[in-house]
């Protein structure tokens, strides 16, 4: 299965918006990759706002 580009949007404790781009086979994997890349998201998964491609 080819990888697709996803944008994962999230906010921090100060309500500042951030985005990270990931290549993954689906949106679930993109979110999991984002959690691996940004440890803050692993601790606070509810701060993830969206995942689009």
What are the roles of these predicted feature ranges?
Residues 1-18:
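Short aromatic-glycine-(Arg/Gly/Cys) micro-motifs in beta-strand/loop hairpins
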Residues 3-6, 26, 51:
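Intrinsically disordered/low-complexity terminal segments and short unstructured peptides
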Residues 15-29:
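A short, exposed loop/beta-hairpin motif centered on an aromatic-Gly-Thr core
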Residues 32-53:
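Short, mixed-charge low-complexity intrinsically disordered segments
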């Amino acid at each position: 299965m080819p990888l697709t580009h996803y944008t994962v949007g999230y906010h921090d404790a100060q309500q500042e918006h951030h985005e990270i781009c990931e290549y993954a086979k689906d949106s679930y994997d993109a979110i999991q990759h984002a959690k691996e890349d940004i440890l803050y998201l692993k601790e606070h998964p509810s701060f993830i706002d969206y995942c689009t491609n």
